[in-house]
């Protein structure tokens, strides 16, 4: 027994849900996927065709319409192709779930460089964008597409990113991190 029953109740009562997960193998983490799978009891087992789409009807008819936002960060510097699996999953989630609507997608590429002090301005800009988006969704019920796009600007070239990432892995800290996670065969 765990707290999933309580989490489903909390989720049902929320006006807005923010799903946030680092990008792992082009999708959400295993823990997030398990959580999403365990939301299935919030739907009835029957079939419903709505707007040409077959879905399960929502179990709780008194639940209100609910919006959700997706946030994910990746070590790779490009949004294109890297977030496709995650995007597809949540767009299907939105189209197959009654009373839910995807209100925004925030993808943060090249997140691993955020820890470097030289990228403090970028980190501050991202924080400001997220705060503005939060205010927009509460006050206006939507997020400006330009705001979502602004988050994806890494402000560095892919070549610079690659060089910095590779240099980290060549350092003693990088080697220790890598070797600690790799099993000996």
Question: What role is predicted for each listed range?
Answer:
Residues 1-2, 111:
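Short linear capping/connector segments at secondary-structure termini
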Residues 2-92, 96:
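Helix-loop-strand module that forms the ligand-binding subsite of alpha/beta enzymes
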Residues 79-81, 90-185:
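Glycine-rich phosphate/pyrophosphate-binding loop and the adjoining helix
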């Amino acid at each position: 027994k765990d707290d999933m029953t309580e989490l489903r109740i909390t989720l049902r009562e929320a006006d807005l849900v923010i799903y946030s997960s680092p990008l792992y193998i082009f999708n959400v983490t295993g823990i997030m996927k398990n959580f999403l799978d365990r939301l299935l009891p919030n739907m009835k087992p029957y079939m419903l065709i709505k707007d040409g789409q077959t879905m399960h009807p929502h179990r709780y008819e008194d639940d209100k319409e609910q919006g959700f936002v997706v946030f994910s960060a990746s070590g790779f510097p490009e949004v294109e192709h890297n977030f496709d699996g995650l995007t597809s999953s949540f767009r299907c989630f939105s189209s197959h779930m009654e009373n839910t609507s995807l209100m925004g997608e925030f993808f943060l590429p090249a997140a691993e460089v955020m820890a470097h002090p030289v990228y403090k301005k970028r980190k501050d800009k991202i924080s400001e964008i997220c705060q503005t988006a939060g205010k927009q969704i509460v006050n206006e019920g939507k997020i400006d597409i330009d705001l979502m796009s602004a988050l994806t600007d890494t402000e560095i070239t892919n070549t610079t990113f690659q060089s910095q990432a590779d240099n980290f892995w060549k350092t003693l800290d990088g080697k220790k991190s890598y070797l600690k996670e790799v099993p000996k065969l």
